[in-house]
Amino acid sequence: MANHKSAEKRIRQTLKRTERNRYYRTRIKNITKAVKEAVASNDATKAEEALKVANKDLHKFVSKGILPKNTAARKVSRLHASVKKLSAQIA
């Protein structure tokens, strides 16, 4: 256990940040999973709706400083490519 006041504060801060980061990591994982599942089930409309939500949320995380800009762009690009490929198969 911590012996100094500053160390106790650091422990509290670390716990708070860990909890917040866990929330965002889970949210990002669930967002991308929703798009991938919609693509896997060959449901183009559901995939496009999920992609819209993913695009909005990932860019929101960039503006909050949670994700680097290029990381979000890469994730959105890959999701968009999979949805586009699905749309091409159906059409």
UniProtKB/Swiss-Prot annotation:
Any one GO biological process: translation
Keywords: Ribonucleoprotein, Ribosomal protein, RNA-binding, rRNA-binding
Keyword set includes Ribonucleoprotein: yes
Molecular function in Gene Ontology: small ribosomal subunit rRNA binding; structural constituent of ribosome
One GO cellular component term noted in the UniProt record for this chain: small ribosomal subunit
Top-rank taxon, per record: Bacteria
Keyword rRNA-binding appears in the UniProt entry: yes
UniProt xrefs under Pfam families: Ribosomal_S20p
Function noted in UniProt: Binds directly to 16S ribosomal RNA.
Family: Belongs to the bacterial ribosomal protein bS20 family.
Name of this protein: Small ribosomal subunit protein bS20
Protein source organism: Wolinella succinogenes (strain ATCC 29543 / DSM 1740 / CCUG 13145 / JCM 31913 / LMG 7466 / NCTC 11488 / FDC 602W)
